């Protein structure tokens, strides 16, 4: 299978992209929008095998993480940056027609892209593990917190009330929450792309989303009313 890697100049930095297969195949390409913000494209490599069916599978690291990592520059970390990045990447790779898959934060970006920009050439859209409303998301995460021990619930509530997200009790509680409801530890038997070390965009995540999965700062503007 042919793997093509490259970089697109963007805002004075570089956006890394990866193409499995050929864009000239008999099926329209599928572009993948990863989660986070700041989670990298790595886990999408499990979909490389779809390229054997004659469809290019395109993933990329959104600015601020992975091979597109940028140190600092908190002014960049908003949906506008990543929205325009997607628009520019389509132009750069000549993706006039394509299928779109957005996972988690990538799904939020996909929804905003479709609602606000009404792009042409989108043949289909797949939304995975995502939502249209940060407010509803936070409500559901807090419902799941209630299934945790009282000690963990208290530690999380205290952190949210005080704004101190460095307390050891909170950090331990949040780690347990993530293992239970968000992201387990990769096993030795998992595909290499899931076990590979990656440069997570912590700054972009905290700035654009918040300190954790259940306390969104709401810099992301929910398109749900639209």
PLM region descriptions:
Residues 220-226:
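Conserved small/polar residues in nucleotide/adenosyl-binding loops
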Residues 160-216:
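Conserved alpha/beta-hydrolase catalytic His-Asp/Glu region
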Residues 62-105:
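Active-site loop/oxyanion-hole signature of alpha/beta-hydrolase fold enzymes
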Residues 13-70:
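Conserved HGGG/HGGXW glycine-rich cap/lid loop of the alpha/beta-hydrolase fold
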Residues 46-51, 74-77, 118, 142-145:
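Glycine-rich, phosphate-binding/catalytic loops in enzymes
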């Amino acid at each position: 299978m042919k793997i093509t890697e490259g970089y697109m100049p963007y805002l004075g930095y570089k956006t890394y992209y990866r193409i499995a297969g050929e864009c000239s195949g008999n099926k329209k390409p599928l572009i993948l929008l990863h989660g986070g913000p700041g989670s990298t494209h790595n886990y999408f490599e499990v979909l490389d095998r779809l390229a054997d069916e004659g469809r290019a599978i395109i993933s990329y690291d959104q600015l601020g993480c992975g091979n597109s990592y940028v140190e600092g520059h908190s002014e960049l970390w908003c949906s506008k940056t990543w929205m325009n990045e997607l628009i520019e990447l389509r132009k750069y790779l000549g993706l006039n027609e394509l299928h779109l898959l957005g996972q988690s934060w990538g799904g939020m970006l996909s929804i905003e892209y479709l609602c606000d920009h009404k792009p042409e050439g989108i043949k289909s859209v797949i939304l995975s593990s995502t939502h249209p409303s940060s407010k509803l998301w936070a409500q559901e995460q807090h419902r799941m917190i209630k299934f945790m021990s009282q000690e963990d619930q208290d530690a999380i509530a205290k952190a949210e009330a005080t704004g101190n997200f460095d307390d050891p009790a909170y950090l331990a509680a949040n780690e347990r929450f993530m293992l239970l409801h968000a992201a387990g530890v990769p096993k030795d038997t998992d595909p290499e792309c899931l076990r590979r070390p990656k440069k997570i965009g912590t700054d972009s995540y905290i700035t654009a989303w918040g300190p954790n999965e259940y306390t969104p700062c709401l810099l992301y503007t929910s398109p749900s009313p639209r």
